[in-house]
């Protein structure tokens, strides 16, 4: 059979014939998914384009979660990243709420897998009643298990919150943050966490096979008045200088408004926002 002039391998551009499953020259699987960057039908099973090398977006480009009590979460790819490497969990547990937010370390491989593994593992552990330390250790093991070597070690930051009538327990490692937005003036947020970073901005604590010993920060607090707990990745907090948080609407409305602000400010990173109302009904 003669090659069809209109068909060529998207990787090596050699002619291929109708019905071929693989390119005879380079071995590329024909009919592969199309790359969102260069348009070639050349995406391999690992999610990379064999022509331009771009890693493809996941189904996490934009997602929202809302619980019956009003707590809400929004995560978005942003405007500059090829995929969303943030991950979040928001779970109802009796009269409380559990949230975990992890930001994949961009310099590590498969950072989106790291954040997803940490969030899934820690969220389930906290919802089952395990301590913050136990949940963190399990999440660390789940992320470390993704590594094929010390040079191929997916990594992510970590923050969790268990919130309920008795107060809030926060735990974190890295630079993903939590804020308290007081009910009388939610526009003025109070930072509750401390970043694990050096003066030039690089993080000094993370989850991953190459993280070494990581000391988990744990903080408990009992707000004396109604308000909202905000947990967010740096895709939001890097744009908070001079910003007043929304002062009205449901937590989902407020989270969407914060996302709009981050995107309007440049949207250079993935954005994840969780808002948990405490002490009163919002919206």
Show the residue positions of the predicted features.
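PP2C/PPM-type serine/threonine phosphatase catalytic domain
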Residues: 1-283
